[in-house]
Each structure stands twice: as C-alpha cells, then as structure tokens.
C-alpha cells in the first residue's frame, strides 16, 4: 500500500487527507513559531519521536524543542499521504534551515529530509503517533562572503546524508544519533519502509 498510487478519493477520504495535511503542516508551523501549547495538541499521548538530536515522547519533544530555543524554520515542499482506516502515513519533503556562528563567522545550515509521520485516528481526530526523518543531504555555507574554511577531515566521521547537520549539532553541544534513516544506507531504508507498510496495513503494531 505504501508508495502505491492512491485510489480515487471519496468525500470521506478527501476530508481525512485534508485533516492530516493540516495536522502535519500545523505541527511544523507551531515548532517554527514557538507555539508550544499548540504543538503539544498534535501528538497522541503515546507518541514517539526519533530525529537527529532527540528520541523520546511527544511531550518530551515539545519541552526539549522549547529548551533548545533555536530558530530553525522548515521550508516545506510537497507531502504524500496514504490512509488505511484509522491509520495513515504522511511523507513531507522539507529543508531544515538554521543559522549559527562558527569561529565568529555566521553560517547557514540547510538539511534536506523527508519527515515521516505515522498517524492514528482517535475519537474522529487525527494525531501524530510516530515521527522520524529520512535524511538526504545538507550544506553549510557562510551567510556573507567570507574566507571561512572548515577542514574536510572534521566531517569524515559523519554520515553523508546528514554530515553538516551532525557537525553543527555537535558544535552546539548536542549528541547525535548516527544510526538514523538516510539515503546513504539504502538497504536499511528499504527495510524501514517495509516496516512502515506493515504498520499501515495492520500487519504490525510496532513502530520502534
């Protein structure tokens, strides 16, 4: 079912798709604009989040994002949604953007990723049950023309799909999970997508 073309939409499935699209866009909007109480309403009570700098519950994710206190807006492109009764998977293509000072030079980090949302319908309302990223590529460049040079050796220990993101998070004092999903590990990624499909089609209840 996952990655297959959706059947023609009925009125009910079209409304469900609109609700899910609104939910995932609003979750990122809330995160980008520090609307923590609003962000909290997007997650199911048993939600689990697994991204570069955080792994834990939805509630903990909101509190950790608040404590991080860093502006990192998301440029959202397109999203694809698959719905199966009370479960759904949405894949959002986005670029995570942030600026930070490295060696007194203002730098721009852009990280391209697919944000994977697994959603459940609870009492006629959709909630995020699980959120994870598939990392693709990133870049780190000076904001203004500069002779700033970072040694390639500094990036060799990082995964190519999120090397610059990992470098910046480490620079800011955050630990990074180096075993996340990324296009540089296609076999593991295919297994991950199969696992998602099993969950979506009710062949499995686990997403961890």
Segments from the language model and where they lie:
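Short, low-complexity N-terminal intrinsically disordered segments enriched in polar/charged residues
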Residues: 1-29, 33, 41
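Outer-membrane beta-barrel proteins
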Residues: 15, 69, 105-107
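A solvent-exposed, acidic/Ser-Thr-rich amphipathic alpha-helical stretch
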Residues: 36-98
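Short, surface-exposed coil-to-beta transition loops
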Residues: 74-76, 109-115
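Short beta-strand edge/turn micro-motifs at domain boundaries
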Residues: 89, 114-163, 173
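Short, cysteine-centered beta-strand-loop-beta hairpins and adjacent loop/turn segments enriched
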Residues: 97-109, 137-141
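A hydrophobic membrane-anchoring alpha-helix module
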Residues: 150-208
């Amino acid at each position: 079912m996952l990655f297959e073309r959706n059947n023609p939409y009925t009125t009910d499935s079209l409304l469900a798709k609109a609700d899910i699209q609104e939910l995932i866009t609003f979750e990122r909007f809330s995160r980008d604009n520090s609307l923590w109480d609003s962000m909290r309403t997007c997650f199911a009570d048993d939600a689990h989040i697994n991204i570069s700098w955080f792994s834990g519950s939805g509630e903990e994710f909101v509190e950790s994002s608040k404590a991080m206190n860093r502006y990192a807006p998301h440029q959202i492109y397109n999203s694809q949604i698959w719905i199966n009764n009370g479960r759904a998977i949405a894949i959002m293509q986005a670029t995570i953007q942030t600026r930070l000072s490295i060696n007194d030079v203002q730098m721009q980090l852009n990280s391209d990723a697919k944000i994977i949302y697994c959603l459940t319908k609870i009492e006629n309302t959709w909630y995020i049950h699980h959120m994870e990223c598939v990392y693709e590529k990133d870049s780190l460049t000076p904001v203004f023309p500069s002779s700033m040079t970072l040694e390639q050796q500094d990036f060799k220990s990082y995964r190519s799909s999120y090397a610059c993101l990992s470098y910046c998070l480490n620079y800011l004092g955050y630990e990074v999970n180096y075993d996340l999903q990324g296009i540089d590990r296609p076999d593991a990624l295919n297994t991950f997508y199969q696992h998602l499909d099993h969950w979506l089609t009710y062949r499995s209840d686990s997403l961890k």
